[in-house]
Amino acid sequence: MPVKPNQPRPSTKQDPSSGASRQRFGYVTGWLHRIRSVPAIAHFIRAGDRFNDRMGNQFGAAITYFSFLSLIPILMVSFATAGFVLASNPDLLTGLINRIVNSISDPSLARTLKNTVNTAVRQRTTVGLTGLLIALYSGVNWIGNLREAIHAQSRDVWERQPHEEEKIYLRYLWDFLSLIGLLLALVITLFLTSVAGSAQATIVRALGLNGIDWLRPVMTLIALSISIFANYLLFLWILWVLPRHNPRRGPLLRGTLMAAIGFEALKFAMTVALPELATSPSGAAFGSVIGLMTFFYFFARLTLFCAAWIATADPKTDINTQAPLPGA
């Protein structure tokens, strides 16, 4: 009978390096747990979870698509307005046509563009009315989609509740009034921003303070504050009036301020990035389209994330009432 060789006994001695690794891992885990337990950071984590669970990225992409699609009838109305202006100023129309002809070396292409301009001027009424009707329809649907996306982030549960159902004509009427309100809010925002920018140099010149160096950053800070205040009014309307719900006042005001500051940062980033895009041939051709789509997408994501942040201000309410996606 063969004798089995002696098997070496497994060593029970622990590797010092593995013990140190576990200690470091435990330290990092505890450190991350302490960071996550900070109320402000925990709030952002809850908002991010709700934003992702309730398809914030997908809703943002849908809002971007509908926003870009709504630009087509707006361009039709713009061309019709230009047609009315050119029709009332024959000299301006003649000068525009001559510039087109002189700037294009290909005679057939110049002739085609000349006929296009003349056709646009002749059909300005038809194009304007058609574009206005399409813009009204697409604008009402756009505001409705934005409202539903904000509702998805703001509801206590994911599914639409029976009491939220409303008649279709009432929904379209409310969306139409909401669209008018949004346009008024945009006009006020643009007015305050433009006044803040133009009045800055006028006030400095009127007071004879051109030579004071430290006044320039102060005036820039004042103009920035006015612009953020205008953004605040716009997002207060979007996050409070548009979805027709009553969140707690504190989270609403703080979330609106966060959206206003983020929107101002987005505008600054776009003013820096768009000139850089225009330097390349492809950027010159598609830069404006890419810039608009990027702006709409980040605007939608910012709006929906702030809506989720406002809705998750109370951790107890969020944990007890948040429901999973249907079929999850």
From Swiss-Prot:
Taxonomic lineage: Bacteria, Pseudomonadati, Pseudomonadota, Gammaproteobacteria, Enterobacterales
Annotated keywords: Cell inner membrane, Cell membrane, Membrane, Transmembrane, Transmembrane helix
Organism: Dickeya dadantii (strain 3937)
Tagged with keyword Transmembrane helix: yes
Annotated stretches, region: Disordered: 1-22
Keyword Nucleus attributed: no
Bilayer topology: Multi-pass membrane protein
Pfam families: Virul_fac_BrkB
Family to which this protein belongs: To E.coli YhjD.
Compartments, record wording: Cell inner membrane
GO CC field: plasma membrane
NCBIfam families: inner membrane protein YhjD
Transmembrane segments: 66-86, 126-146, 176-196, 221-241, 255-275, 290-310
Compositionally biased residues, Polar residues: 9-21
Name of the protein in question: Uncharacterized protein Dda3937_02003
Main localization category: membrane
